[in-house]
Structure formats: structure tokens, C-alpha cells
């Protein structure tokens, strides 16, 4: 971090001489006031806010004036001006972040995506890396390419575990055993370096701190919980931002800055905190933090998506904020598991949350749905009816009577904007996971009888997968593991527990045979994963109690 006394010494004229020494407090990019088209641009105000201030302080007030950020009301006894300079320097943010965070006004094009290789340019070979994956959306976000790298010492960290489990007991003891065996069985990765945590609930944070090594990098997709984790560590271990020069020297905060940790800890943490936002790709540069006796690096998020379509283009702004703000997640669903019932109809009756997806159960099936996605749900006679209603909501000049159920923009108010997916056969319950959105639990009830495949229609560009219900899978597996003294695996070996879905043509009638055909194509180079290939599909689905999860296959 800047040595503030040195940074302010000799500055008498408003120019880049002040700005170049300051990074945006939100995204960590270097500030500049010369080119609005380049990152880090900061708008000059039209007039100075207070000409009576000494020149150094004028410059810093000048920086912040157009962002409506108020000066701290606290002042040190010896030099109040010095404290004001310090606060201002540490709180300057670029125009892009100011508009996005304070006015909720942002252009997605100003938040470009990065690839894994882009981000790895920040990470020296042989470094300690924490691969951050939100457990709530497992296996989405899990990147085998990161875990298999020989040039990095990688640990898997599963965040947001409070959105899957009722308490931290399973998170502490049961998840690591399950994940070790899952990685070995599924990806042939032999590793026991897995932590499941919840930064919001403070689950396993002390264990995590004791484990991670000095100079560790946090690596993952946008909005997976990296910055929230850092802020929890900063609060728990009195951490702060640092700046590391090209020689590796750590520039720690000045004594005046550190003094505030004791005199005004709230303000100190506000200044030091990592930028947490529901906006993806907010972080644009690596930021180092001193946490206890260790250095931790927050890296920008990287994308693995092949689609350039962004959720901001599809989903209503207010709905999207609810989806991304994890602190708004209602944990009562985890404990109570309140379900909604739905019967499959001959007309193609469907269930939706905001129009973000349409779930179509087969005719005659009785289904229970537990929703872990924010927003009210709605059922429609068929998909066409749902799309027609939401199209009216978007085009209506006034308030449509069903507008509270609409979470999509007009750009996807056509059936052609959705992809049709068939869910491979299952018995009992599954969880359907939508990347960066959440998941629902789907349960078929009554005596098993195959009535057809469930379908789900999803906007193009959104990744989806299914899994056996995660909490029950880990709990039952752990019990089996303990009862057999570790002889039985806590992760099932007799069947796949995760799967991708199968895209269908809109007019495909024989979805079961189409699924088998796609399954054979997807496993053509992975023959060891094939199961039941010689069985007739319609005979196979009559015996799911013995032949579980046919045609399940996950494409990493």
C-alpha cells in the first residue's frame, strides 16, 4: 500500500502526479484522468469544492468531488489534514466503478471477461492457489484444468456451503472425505486438499486461515465468493491492503493508517475491504492483502463460457441483483424444504421462475419442486402461454397484472431464444443447477412408472446440469463410510451422480432414443464411462431401481 506521507510530498498542482500513485479502491486498477476511453478514467469536476484547503488536500478533494463521497467525520488529534488526505487516497474509485456501485448504472461492455490464461499471467509458476468454487452450484464452476496443473499447488475451496447444508458439521467433516473420493473416481485427481466454507456464516474460516500458505492466490470465476472470503478474513484477523513492488518488497500502511484499526475499526475495514458487488468482472487487477502473517492475492474472475451472451442482456436488473446477492439467500428453504406440487399435462404444462427457465414434466407425472432461486414462481398451460404473458409484461405501457412474475427482458420473449433440453432418466429426486442463477430440487412422487422424460427450456447461453441431491448424497455417503471403517466409499462408484443435459430439436418426439444417441456421441472418446449401451432404452427405464441414472454423463 502507499506510504501516504511520501505519496503526498511535493504535490502542489492537480495532475496525474497524484492519480498515478493511487489505485481504484474498488477494482484495483490504476487511476488516470487523461483518456475517457481507457480503463481507470476518473472525471474531473468543473469546480474545486473548497479553495481554502491546503493544496495537497485540494487535489484529493478534487478527485472525489464528482463522486459524492463524503469526508470522514473523524480526525486525528495531531494532524487532521493528514488523516483526511489518507482517507481520500484510499477511497478514490474510477468513474466506471462509481457509476456501477453508487448509481447502478453500468455498461456490460466495460466489464470485459478474462480467460483462465489471462488471469494465470498474474500467477508465478509454483505458486499456492486456492480454486474457489461455489458449492451451491456444484459441479458448475469446478475447473479440472486448474486442479490438474503441475505448475501450481492447488487447493479446492467450496464457498457458499450454507446454501446447501443446515449446519457446519457436514461442511467440516463430511465434505472433504466425499470430495477426495469424487475427484479420484470422476477426474482421476488424487488430492485431499479440499475445504468447504461459508464466509457469511463464518464456517471453517479459522481452519481455512491455518491451512493456506503465505503468498496464496484466489482463482475462480466471477461472483464465486473470492472477495467475500477475503473480507471475512480481514475482519477476523485485522487484515489490510498492501502493495508489493517489482522487487517483492511489501509496502505496508503507514502508522497513521494502522492506528485507525484501533481507534475506528469500522472505518478502517471499510477502507481496506475488497470490492464486493453483484456485478461480475468488477475486479480488473490483482490486489494483495496482509492477513495475519500471510499475503493473500485477490485475482480477477475468469470465464470459461463459449457464449458471449451475458445475463445482463437477458434478465431484469432487479431480479439479477437478487440472484447475485448471496446475503439475500433465504436459508429457511434449506431447513424446511417447502415444496410446490405440479402435475404433468398433455398440453405441456410448465413451471417457471421469472421466465428464466421453463420446466415441463411428462404427462401424468406428479412432481414436487423445492425452489432455491429468488423470485416468485408461476405455472402456465404451456411454454407458449408463459412467453406470451411475459412479452405482454415487457411491452405493456402500464403495470401488467402478472408483472411481478416476469424476470426477463423482451429480448428473450420468443420461444426461438430458448434451448430445449431433455433430462436423462432418474428415479426419486434430482437437483437442476443453472450457472450463476441457482438450483431447484425436483422430486417425482408415487410408485415409479416411466411416463416420459422431463424437459427444461433455458435461454441460449445459460449453462445447466443435474446432480443427485447434494446434502443427502454427502450425509448418506459419510454414514456408509463410517459404518464400514472407510472400506466403502462415501461417493458412489456404481453410478454417475452428475450429468449434463441433452439438447433436443424443438419438434423431437422420441426424446428417449434421441438422448441415447447423444449419449453415445458424447462418450465416443470416453468409452469407460459408458453404461447400458446394449439395453433397449424403453426396457431400461422400466428398471431404474436396479439400473440407476442411465445416460448420465457430465461434460467438463
From Swiss-Prot:
Single biological process term from Gene Ontology: maturation of SSU-rRNA
GO cellular component terms given for this protein: mitochondrial inner membrane; mitochondrion
Organelle transit peptide: 1-21
Compartments where located: Mitochondrion
Gene3D superfamilies on file: P-loop containing nucleotide triphosphate hydrolases
All copies of domain CP-type G, residue ranges: 113-305
Top-level division of the source organism's lineage: Eukaryota
UniProtKB keywords: Mitochondrion, Transit peptide
Gene Ontology MF terms in the entry: GTP binding
Function according to Swiss-Prot or TrEMBL: Interacts genetically with prohibitins and thus may be involved in the mitochondrial lipid metabolism.
Family statement drawn from the similarity comment of this UniProt entry: Belongs to the TRAFAC class YlqF/YawG GTPase family. GEP3 subfamily.
Note: Present with 937 molecules/cell in log phase SD medium.
Stated name of the protein: Genetic interactor of prohibitins 3, mitochondrial
Amino acid at each position: 500500500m502507499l506510504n501516504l506521507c511520501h505519496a503526498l510530498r511535493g504535490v502542489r498542482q492537480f495532475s496525474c502526479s497524484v492519480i498515478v500513485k493511487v489505485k481504484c479502491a474498488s477494482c484495483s486498477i490504476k487511476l488516470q484522468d487523461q483518456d475517457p476511453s481507457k480503463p481507470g478514467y476518473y472525471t474531473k469536476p468543473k469546480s474545486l469544492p473548497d479553495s481554502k484547503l491546503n493544496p495537497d488536500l485540494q487535489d484529493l478533494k478534487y478527485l472525489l468531488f464528482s463522486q459524492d463521497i463524503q469526508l470522514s467525520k473523524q480526525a486525528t488529534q495531531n494532524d487532521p489534514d493528514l488523516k483526511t488526505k489518507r482517507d481520500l487516497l484510499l477511497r478514490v474509485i474510477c468513474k466506471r466503478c462509481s457509476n456501477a456501485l453508487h448509481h447502478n448504472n453500468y455498461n456490460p461492455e466495460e466489464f470485459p471477461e478474462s480467460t483462465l490464461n489471462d488471469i494465470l499471467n498474474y500467477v508465478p509458476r509454483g505458486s499456492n492457489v486456492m480454486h474457489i468454487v461455489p458449492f451451491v452450484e456444484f459441479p458448475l464452476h469446478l475447473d479440472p484444468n486448474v486442479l490438474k496443473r503441475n505448475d501450481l499447488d492447488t487447493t479446492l475451496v467450496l464457498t457458499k456451503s450454507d446454501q446447501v447444508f443446515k449446519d457446519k458439521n457436514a461442511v467440516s467433516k463430511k465434505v472433504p472425505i466425499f470430495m477426495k473420493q469424487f475427484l479420484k473416481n470422476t477426474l482421476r485427481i488424487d488430492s485431499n486438499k479440499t475445504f468447504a466454507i461459508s464466509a457469511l456464516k463464518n464456517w471453517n474460516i479459522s481452519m481455512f486461515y491455518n491451512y493456506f500458505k503465505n503468498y496464496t492466490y484466489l482463482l475462480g470465476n466471477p461472483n464465486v465468493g473470492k472477495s467475500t472470503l477475503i473480507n471475512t478474513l480481514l475482519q477476523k484477523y485485522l487484515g489490510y491492503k498492501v502493495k508489493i513492488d517489482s522487487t517483492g518488497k511489501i509496502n505496508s500502511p503507514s502508522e497513521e493508517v494502522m492506528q485507525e484499526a484501533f481507534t475506528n475499526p469500522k472505518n478502517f475495514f471499510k477502507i481496506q475491504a475488497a470490492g464486493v458487488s453483484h456485478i461480475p468482472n468488477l475486479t480488473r487487477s490483482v490486489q494483495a492483502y496482509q492477513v495475519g502473517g500471510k499475503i493473500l492475492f485477490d485475482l480477477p474472475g475468469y470465464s470459461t463460457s463459449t457464449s458471449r451472451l451475458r445475463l445482463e442482456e437477458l434478465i431484469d436488473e432487479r431480479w439479477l441483483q437478487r440472484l447475485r446477492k448471496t446475503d439475500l439467500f433465504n436459508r429457511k428453504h434449506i431447513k424446511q424444504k417447502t415444496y410446490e406440487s405440479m402435475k404433468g399435462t398433455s398440453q405441456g404444462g410448465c413451471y417457471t421462475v421469472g421466465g428464466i427457465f421453463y420446466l415441463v414434466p411428462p404427462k401424468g407425472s406428479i412432481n414436487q419442486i423445492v425452489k432455491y432461486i429468488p423470485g416468485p414462481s408461476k405455472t402456465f398451460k404451456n411454454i407458449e402461454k408463459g412467453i406470451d404473458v411475459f412479452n405482454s409484461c415487457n411491452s405493456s405501457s402500464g403495470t401488467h397484472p402478472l408483472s411481478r412474475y416476469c424476470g426477463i427482458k423482451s429480448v428473450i420473449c420468443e420461444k426461438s431464444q430458448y434451448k430445449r433440453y431433455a433430462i436423462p432418466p432418474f428415479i426419486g429426486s434430482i437437483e437442476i443447477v443453472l450457472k450463476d442463477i441457482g438450483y431447484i430440487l425436483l422430486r417425482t412422487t408415487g410408485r415409479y412408472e416411466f411416463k416420459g422424460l422431463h424437459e427444461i427450456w433455458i435461454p441460449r447461453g445459460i449453462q445447466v446440469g443435474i446432480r443427485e441431491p447434494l446434502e443427502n448424497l454427502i450425509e448418506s455417503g459419510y454414514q456408509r463410510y463410517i459404518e464400514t471403517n472407510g472400506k466403502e466409499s462415501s461417493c458412489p462408484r456404481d453410478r454417475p451422480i452428475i450429468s449434463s443435459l441433452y439438447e433436443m430439436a424443438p419438434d423431437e418426439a422420441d426424446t428417449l432414443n434421441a438422448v441415447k444417441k447423444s449419449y453415445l456421441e458424447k462418450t465416443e472418446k470416453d468409452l469407460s464411462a459408458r453404461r447400458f449401451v446394449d439395453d433397449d432404452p424403453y426396457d431400461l427405464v422400466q428398471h431404474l431401481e436396479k439400473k440407476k441414472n442411465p445416460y448420465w454423463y457430465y461434460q467438463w
